[in-house]
Amino acid sequence: MSKIKVLIVDDSALVRQMLQEMLKSDPEIEVVGTASDPYDAREKVKQLHPDVLTLDVEMPRMDGVTFLKNLMRLHPLPVVMISTLTEKGADITFEALDLGAVDFVAKPKIDLQHTFEDYTDEICRKVKTASKVSKWQLERQYARYVANKESKPKVLSKPGSLVSKVVEKFTTDAIVPKKAPSDFSKPSHKVIALGASTGGTEAIKEVLMRLPSTTPAIVITQHIPASFSLPFAQRMNSVSEMEVTQAEDRQPILAGHVYIAPGDKHLLVERTSSGYICRLNDGPPVNRHKPSVDVMFRTVVQSVGKNAVGVLLTGMGADGAKGMKELQEIGVPTIVQDEKTCVVWGMPGEAVKLGAADYVLPLGSIPEKILALIKK
């Protein structure tokens, strides 16, 4: 089997060296070259024909987003962005994901010794995942970006760690012990529970842009760094008719509102005498993730019951698949994004394997199905 050819683009010689060392440690990956700026990268893409690029977000002469825009227009390639974990870095990274970048990782730190193995594992996994993304998928995402820019959707006037430590593998039970759902005979509000990972920031945007302000409450767990979740919520708030916020502990869950899990806390849904509230939990990662989709889904089973709708979008791994099965087993309708429109059909694919998906739909059909199900 031929190796995945990677071109590293970064203005820092030290970062280029670190990334090269990490990627070369994987027998399935070959680093075919490095470039210090986008002009150098442009020539090396033509010469070396890489399968995947790692691209620094912020560089001199031409920034990573401008280069990515030209690349996706002229020579689409899977790209993993190397991002600084800052508000500015978050904004640039989200624009890169808009353009068609497959995923992102934090820029490696100089004092990486204690987390070197974890970082190496993460970037190698993401490069290998990116290599499976087709040219057609990249072209479709870029066309969607251009269409959204040309349509200039009105921005509504509203207020508005990627390097994980070595952790034990915990199950959902470590955060939310399994128990029978409460009595849901009394009428209560609907809640839509949505989970996503790789490719999810764009998929979530596509869903939220098509839901009216009258939609019931939505709780979202997206795998994302802690410093990125608030900018992500603000970005979603600017394109949605619903009010989108980063969830806060004990925040009431209201219709017409969207609550996004902070990047370093599990989001739980709790039922009170007056309705539902968000609870934030600082327990260990589950399925190697914090926040975890399975954890959120478990609490929706226990607190919302049949008044919920479960949705699982694009993402690497299996987080959310078991939780979706638990939702389905109590009669909650479940929707999974189909393989063709996913960046990575990991989490949705695992849900399908478990028989947990009532509906397997292309991304563009999911908002309509959500609206149909909440009327039942």
Curated annotation (Swiss-Prot):
EC number: 3.1.1.61, 3.5.1.44
InterPro entries, per the entry: CheB-like, CheB_C, CheY-like_superfamily, Sig_transdc_resp-reg_Me-estase, Sig_transdc_resp-reg_receiver
Domain comment in the entry: Contains a C-terminal catalytic domain, and an N-terminal region which modulates catalytic activity.
A family per Pfam: Response_reg
Gene3D superfamilies per the UniProt record, alphabetical: 3.40.50.2300, Methylesterase CheB, C-terminal domain
Entry similarity comment: Belongs to the CheB family.
Sequence positions bearing 4-aspartylphosphate: D56
Catalytic residues (UniProt): S197, H223, D319
GO biological process: chemotaxis
Domain Response regulatory: 5-122
Protein name per the record: Protein-glutamate methylesterase/protein-glutamine glutaminase
Protein's job: Involved in chemotaxis. Part of a chemotaxis signal transduction system that modulates chemotaxis in response to various stimuli. Catalyzes the demethylation of specific methylglutamate residues introduced into the chemoreceptors (methyl-accepting chemotaxis proteins or MCP) by CheR. Also mediates the irreversible deamidation of specific glutamine residues to glutamic acid.
CheB-type methylesterase domain mapped to chain residues: 185-376
Naturally occurring in which organism (per UniProt): Hydrogenovibrio crunogenus (strain DSM 25203 / XCL-2) (Thiomicrospira crunogena)
Catalyses which reaction(s): [protein]-L-glutamate 5-O-methyl ester + H2O = L-glutamyl-[protein] + methanol + H(+); L-glutaminyl-[protein] + H2O = L-glutamyl-[protein] + NH4(+)
PTM statement from Swiss-Prot or TrEMBL: Phosphorylated by CheA. Phosphorylation of the N-terminal regulatory domain activates the methylesterase activity.
This protein's record includes keyword Iron-sulfur: no
Keywords, sorted A to Z: Chemotaxis, Cytoplasm, Hydrolase, Phosphoprotein
